[in-house]
């Protein structure tokens, strides 16, 4: 078989092979080949090698896949086994958890039961503690009572102990003798009769003592009689028991023992009754002590009242204190004011008023003063009479001596002294303003009022305090306030006096002049009319009777009246 192969021109040009230029190809005719030749020719190419290589690569891949699959299967088997183990462990853990939960619930239930039991036990414990305390307290009280009863029994059964010891000795002797022989019934009856006689004698003695104590304390007699009756009944019972025991001649020792027991019971009953009587006597003694304390308290209260009454009736401080105070203030006031003291006639009138303390004294004094002051000029008759009456009342009140001055009136007297000092200061200002120079002017009523005020201030200083009563306190306080207001009015009066116009006469001036000494004002008026105004200050100094001249008085030589301009400026 011929096969034609097609070759490219570029590939075979160098070999000198004919080419078909039109087509660019060359046709090569191959001879037929055998199988061997084909094999040789086939070996020249790489087709077989490529196939082999491809086959080998596929084989290698298959082998690798097989190997990897085997490994994966082994790994999977291992993992499956591990997972199965884990699953088994998980199942076991789940079962364990279920068991633990069940146990936990059981434990919780047990815990709740235990807590409830604990609370119950604690409550029982606390209640038992309280009960134990109460029982201990009761036991202590009972022990105390038993000890007290034992002490009382020991104190009261001292004479009975000897008798009991004798009876015990006899009982022991009889108990030892009963083994050898039996005692005679007659002897036993004689012994029991002697014991009964002794007990009767003791009861009679006790009853006699109770009767004597009942006479002393009749309140306890009834209690003692009741106790005596109870003791007699106990004694009768003892006698009956003794007779019954005597009838039993076989058991002599037992009879003696029963006698002792009965005697002890009797002593115990007697002690209880005696303790009751003692308690009653203690209550009575307490009542007596309380009554005595009340009586003492009443006595002390009465003594305090009596002492207060005595203090109220004690004499008050003497008049020397007041007499020593008022002259000192009087002297200081004279140093400041340098005005004349009251005249001798005024002192005489004061002495007369001291002697006359009754209603007749006041009436006569009013008549005398009205007779002395009839020469006043410039005032109407009705106003003169009112002023004279008030002046007389004022002099009478200031001229009287101090009677018994109580301690609660000292404050009022101190208030008076303060008022007098204020009046002194007002009077000093009044003198500086030159009132004495204008006393001889046409205004007689105003001069009288000014002189009257000056004299009133001296009179208030020189007068002695009057007896003050408690119901006059409020009136005096009112007077003090009014006097302070009047002092301010007195300071303002000089300006009214210096005015050129003649002011009309008012009732206020009369009321202000009603509280002063009118007799002294009359004397000052007469002296001022007789002598000029320049020598008034020297005359005021000379009128002091029985007083030496002082240096303070010599310094003041003249006084100049301030001008109207200075007055208008408000300096005065």
From Swiss-Prot:
| Region named Disordered | 185-221, 244-285, 333-352, 484-572
**Does the keyword Coiled coil feature in the UniProt annotation?**
yes
Record keywords, A-Z: Chromosome partition, Coiled coil
Residue ranges with Polar residues bias: 192-201
Q: Which Pfam families match?
A: Shugoshin_C
Does Coiled coil appear among the keywords?
yes
Enumerate composition-biased segments (Basic and acidic residues).
244-257, 336-352, 523-542, 552-572
- Chain segments annotated as coiled-coil in the UniProt record: 59-110
Q: What else is known?
A: Knock-down mutants show meiotic defects, reduction in seed set and fertility, and premature separation of sister chromatids before meiosis II, but no defects in vegetative development or growth. The localization of SYN1 and ZYP1 are not affected. Sgo1 and sgo2 double mutants are almost completely sterile and show a premature separation of sister chromatids at anaphase I.
Q: What does this protein do?
A: Protects sister chromatid centromere cohesion in meiosis I but not through the protection of the cohesin SYN1. Required with SGO2 for full protection of centromeric cohesion during anaphase I. Required to prevent precocious release of pericentromeric cohesins during meiosis. Not necessary for the maintenance of the synaptonemal complex (SC). Not required for monopolar spindle orientation in meiosis I.
Q: Which PANTHER family match?
A: SHUGOSHIN 1, SHUGOSHIN 2
Which family is annotated? Belongs to the shugoshin family.
Q: What is this protein called?
A: SHUGOSHIN 1
Q: Which organism is it from?
A: Arabidopsis thaliana (Mouse-ear cress)
The lineage is: Eukaryota, Viridiplantae, Streptophyta, Embryophyta, Tracheophyta
């Amino acid at each position: 078989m011929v096969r034609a192969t097609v070759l490219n021109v570029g590939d075979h040009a160098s070999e000198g092979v004919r080419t078909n230029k039109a087509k660019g190809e060359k046709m090569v005719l191959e001879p037929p080949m055998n199988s061997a030749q084909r094999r040789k020719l086939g070996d020249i190419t790489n087709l077989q090698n490529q196939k082999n290589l491809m086959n080998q690569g596929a084989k290698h891949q298959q082998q690798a896949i097989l190997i990897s699959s085997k490994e994966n299967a082994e790994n999977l088997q291992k993992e499956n086994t591990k997972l199965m183990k884990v699953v088994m462990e998980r199942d076991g853990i789940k079962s364990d958890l279920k068991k633990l939960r069940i146990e936990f619930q059981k434990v919780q239930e047990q815990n709740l039961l235990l807590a409830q039991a604990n609370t119950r036990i604690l409550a029982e414990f606390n209640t038992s503690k309280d009960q134990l305390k109460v029982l201990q307290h009761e036991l202590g009280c009972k022990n105390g009572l038993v000890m007290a009863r034992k002490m009382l029994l020991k104190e009261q059964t001292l004479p009975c102990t000897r008798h009991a010891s004798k009876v015990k000795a006899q009982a022991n002797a009889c108990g030892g003798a009963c083994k050898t022989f039996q005692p005679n019934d007659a002897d036993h009856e004689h012994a029991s009769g002697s014991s009964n006689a002794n007990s009767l004698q003791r009861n009679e003695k006790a009853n006699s003592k109770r009767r004597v104590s009942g006479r002393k304390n009749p309140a306890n007699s009834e209690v003692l009689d009741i106790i005596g009756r109870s003791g007699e009944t106990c004694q009768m019972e003892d006698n009956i028991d003794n007779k019954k025991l005597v009838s039993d001649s076989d058991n002599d020792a037992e009879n003696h023992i029963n006698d002792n027991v009965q005697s002890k019971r009797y002593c115990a009953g007697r002690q209880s009754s005696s303790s009751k009587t003692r308690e009653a006597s203690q209550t009575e003694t307490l009542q007596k002590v309380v009554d005595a304390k009340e009586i003492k308290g009443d006595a002390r209260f009465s003594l305090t009242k009596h002492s207060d009454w005595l203090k109220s009736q004690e004499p008050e401080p003497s008049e020397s204190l007041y007499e020593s105070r008022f002259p000192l203030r009087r002297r200081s006031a004279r140093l400041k004011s340098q005005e004349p003291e009251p005249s001798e006639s005024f002192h005489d009138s004061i002495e007369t008023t001291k002697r006359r303390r009754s209603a007749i004294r006041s009436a006569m004094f009013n008549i005398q003063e009205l007779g002395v002051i009839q020469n006043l000029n410039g005032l109407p008759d009705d106003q003169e009479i009112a002023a004279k009456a008030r002046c007389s009342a004022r002099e009478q009140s200031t001229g009287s001596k101090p009677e018994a001055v109580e301690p609660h009136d000292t404050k009022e007297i101190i208030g008076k002294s303060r008022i007098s000092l204020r009046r002194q200061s007002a009077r000093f200002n009044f003198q500086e303003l030159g009132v004495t120079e204008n006393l001889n002017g046409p205004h007689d009523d105003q001069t009288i009022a000014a002189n009257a005020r000056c004299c009133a201030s001296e009179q208030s200083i020189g007068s002695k305090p009057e007896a003050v009563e408690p119901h006059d306190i409020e009136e005096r306080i009112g007077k003090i306030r009014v006097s302070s207001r009047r002092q301010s009015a007195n300071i303002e009066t000089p300006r009214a006096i210096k005015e050129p116009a003649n002011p009309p006469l008012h009732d206020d001036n009369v009321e202000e002049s009603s509280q002063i000494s009118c007799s002294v004002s009359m004397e000052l008026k007469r002296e001022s009319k007789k002598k000029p105004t320049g020598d008034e200050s020297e005359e005021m100094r000379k009128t002091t009777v029985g007083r030496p001249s002082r240096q303070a008085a010599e310094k003041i030589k003249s006084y100049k009246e301030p001008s109207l301009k200075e007055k208008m400026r408000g300096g005065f």
